[in-house]
């Protein structure tokens, strides 16, 4: 027999670890006539060639499938964008029936069983969350941020008031009490824990109009690094049933998510008056808002890193359940009548920012007996400044501008009787 192409015996063939490229595989014709050893090698080679051809066919098929799936993905993404680009209806998610359907409430108050877009994250789809519905089919196509359809907003770092405690004249005791109840628990909570007491959860500021309640809260917002949420009590009263309690939950949820936080509710008497046997749906809705507020303040989800400040001019009308300890632990009164020391501090604080004539004597205004609140004193100084601007003066003349401003802002005799309904 002639020379054999493969000299290694069949029982000593080295195992193949990697398929060789086609161009490196020997020609089949070169293996002819190699005997039994050559026939085994030839059979192995043919088997490997068939396997390689099969793999190449599979590769081409997979590439075709990949290109087809990419086209389908692009079409699906374009369809989703088209659906979400049309004007959508804001609704509220109620509950999920299964993975693909759920119950939603539209802005008109009606409930619908709708399909849920498959691309939405089901973990973010929680009851009472705001959602976007298709205008024709009411299908749930998007999940909105919690504050997207709410008037509740949190003040950013650049939006906080520029009022400091030094800008608030007088009110030394009120400043100390509100700092102990609001700022200290947020900054030095360990002190309360070491003593073994719970810090105050809420503070009520009450007093006549113009006594500095809101201004002191502005100073609190400026001096603390905590998140600050401001809302007016009347904003909770909405057109549709259930919207008010939902807004209360949204406010406290936002505060807990951004804790430490301070919630300031101004004019709390709009929703927290004493409860009675309501005869109308509107009165019952206001009472439901109050119940939700009471639950959020001392319920199971209450947080020590969330402080509530409320302000009102009518503390006598508030519900006793709101005033009890555990909800509003500290009640700070802002008196309408200021003594001479308080007046001097207010006049000096306001006058320090103004250009006054050297002859100005504020003591002549301080010693007068008319009742002056902080807002009235600020109005006197502002009116004096406006009169100086009107006359193109750089300084305020005491006997003319200040006296005229005092007479314009402080009513006496018959003029005071006409404005008695404001008191």
Curated annotation (Swiss-Prot):
One Pfam family of this chain: AAA
Family matches, as InterPro entries: 26S_Proteasome_ATPase, AAA+_ATPase, ATPase_AAA_core, ATPase_AAA_CS, NA-bd_OB-fold, P-loop_NTPase, Prot_ATP_ID_OB_2nd
Top-level lineage group: Eukaryota
Subcellular localization, as worded in the UniProt entry: Cytoplasm; Nucleus
Alphabetical UniProt keywords: ATP-binding, Cytoplasm, Nucleotide-binding, Nucleus, Proteasome
KW Membrane (keyword) present: no
Binding-site residues, ATP: 207-214
GO cellular component, one term: proteasome regulatory particle, base subcomplex
Molecular function, one GO term: ATP binding
Role this protein plays: The 26S proteasome is involved in the ATP-dependent degradation of ubiquitinated proteins. The regulatory (or ATPase) complex confers ATP dependency and substrate specificity to the 26S complex.
Protein name as annotated: 26S proteasome regulatory subunit 6B homolog
Origin organism lineage: Eukaryota, Fungi, Dikarya, Ascomycota, Pezizomycotina
């Amino acid at each position: 027999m002639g020379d054999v192409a493969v000299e290694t015996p069949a029982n000593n063939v080295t195992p193949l670890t990697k398929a060789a490229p086609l161009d490196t595989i020997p020609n089949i014709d070169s293996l002819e006539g190699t005997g039994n050893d050559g026939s085994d090698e030839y059979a192995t080679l043919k088997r490997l060639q068939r396997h390689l051809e099969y793999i190449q066919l599979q590769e081409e098929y997979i590439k075709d499938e990949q290109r087809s799936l990419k086209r389908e993905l692009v079409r699906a993404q374009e369809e989703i964008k088209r659906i979400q680009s049309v004007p959508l209806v804001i609704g509220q998610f109620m509950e999920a029936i299964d993975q693909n359907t759920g119950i939603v409430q539209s802005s008109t108050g009606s409930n619908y069983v709708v399909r849920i877009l498959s691309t939405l994250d089901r973990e973010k789809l929680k009851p009472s969350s705001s959602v976007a519905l298709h205008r024709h089919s009411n299908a749930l196509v998007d999940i909105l941020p919690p504050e997207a359809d709410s008037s509740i907003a949190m003040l950013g770092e650049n939006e906080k008031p520029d009022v400091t405690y030094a800008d608030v004249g007088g009110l030394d005791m009120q400043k100390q009490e509100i700092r102990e109840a609001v700022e200290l628990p947020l900054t030095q909570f360990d002190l309360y824990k070491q003593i073994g007491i719970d810090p105050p959860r809420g503070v009520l500021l009450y007093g006549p109009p113009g006594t500095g309640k809101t201004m002191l809260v502005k100073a609190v917002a400026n001096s603390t690094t905590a998140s600050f949420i401001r809302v007016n009590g009347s904003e909770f009263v909405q057109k549709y049933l259930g919207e008010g309690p939902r807004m209360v939950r949204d406010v406290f949820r936002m505060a807990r998510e951004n804790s430490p936080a301070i919630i300031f509710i101004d004019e709390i008497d709009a929703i927290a008056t004493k409860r009675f046997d309501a005869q109308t749906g509107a009165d019952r809705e206001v009472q439901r808002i109050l119940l939700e507020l009471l639950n959020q303040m001392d319920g199971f989800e209450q947080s020590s890193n969330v402080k509530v400040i409320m302000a009102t001019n009518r503390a006598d009308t508030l519900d006793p359940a709101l005033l009890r300890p555990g909800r509003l632990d500290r009640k700070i009164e802002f008196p309408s009548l200021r003594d001479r020391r308080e007046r001097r501090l207010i006049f000096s604080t306001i006058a320090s920012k103004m250009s006054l004539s050297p002859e100005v004597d504020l003591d002549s205004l301080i010693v007068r007996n008319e009742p002056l609140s902080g807002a009235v004193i600020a109005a006197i100084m502002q009116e004096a400044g406006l009169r100086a601007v009107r006359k193109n003066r750089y300084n305020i003349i005491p006997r003319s501008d200040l006296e005229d401003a005092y007479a314009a802002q402080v009513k006496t005799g018959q003029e005071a009787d006409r404005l008695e309904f404001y008191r």
